[in-house]
From Swiss-Prot:
Major subcellular site: membrane
SMART domains, per database record: WD40 (SM00320)
Annotated protein name in UniProt: Protein transport protein SEC13
Keywords for this protein: Cytoplasmic vesicle, Endoplasmic reticulum, ER-Golgi transport, Membrane, mRNA transport, Nuclear pore complex, Nucleus, Protein transport, Repeat, Translocation, Transport, WD repeat
Organism expressing this protein natively: Yarrowia lipolytica (strain CLIB 122 / E 150) (Yeast)
Taxonomic path: Eukaryota, Fungi, Dikarya, Ascomycota, Saccharomycotina
TM spans (from-to): none
Amino acid sequence: MVTIGNTHDDLIHDAVLDYYGKRLATCSSDKTIKIFEIDGDNHKLVETLRGHEGPVWQVSWAHPKFGSIIASASYDGKVFIWREENGRWTNIAQHQHNASVNSVVWAPQEYGPLLLCASSDGNVSVVEFKEGGNCEATTFAAHDVGANSASWAPPAVSGSLIQPINGKASNNIRIVTGGCDNLVKIWKYDPSSKTYVIEETLSGHKDWVRDVAWSSSVLSKSYIASASQDKTVIVWTQEGNQPWKKKLLQDIPFPDVVWKVSWSLSGNVLAVSGGDNKVTLWKENLTGEWESAGVVEE
């Protein structure tokens, strides 16, 4: 286990390992991003990235096939794209929203170098990063009061272990968003209009949806988890083209606001974290019920 000490001057909001688990990016209310090299239980700070004018909420590593690249999202309404070359990190591109950018995540590599952003201005944007630092954004209104989180669907369809035929993943892109309207929304890319159109609106929460996560599992069902300020987590499932079904992760509310949901790489274990400073792990049993798989206390 690697413990990062007092390297930031304020709260740390996100910490993400790169594809190989060799580098860690952290971001903080001190307006900086820090890059660490990880070697076993040891770590070394190698770079501090500055430029944001507000708290940095989230960071995301691009797949290494696109280079050594991270994106950062900040309260200042900006998304920065940073690239490392010859040991030096530089800010190579920027993307602007009209309010805090709360979520930023690179797409699965099959979709290409696409960046998904959710903002308090109510909009969600998908930014295509091009060589030379140029970016082309598709922006659409998603949640009237503000968008808090967004997540990519896996590139293969549920029920299949293969990728889309002819590799045309761009024709099958779907995303899920969560917002301050208490709703979870599923969007699909429409090649004819070159934008994202609403495919499904899922209602079930009674307060802001703080986080959404689409499981990478491509077996019999699609899974989406949503975490809310109403102290609940809902797992939404879909088999084939059937309607989405909702199920509370547990019948009683969590002790505090639920801030974050995250699926394991295999897509079958769900981690839940909230205001009670605990991380709980959950797994679906053979009857479709969700059972506790452990607790991590801070």
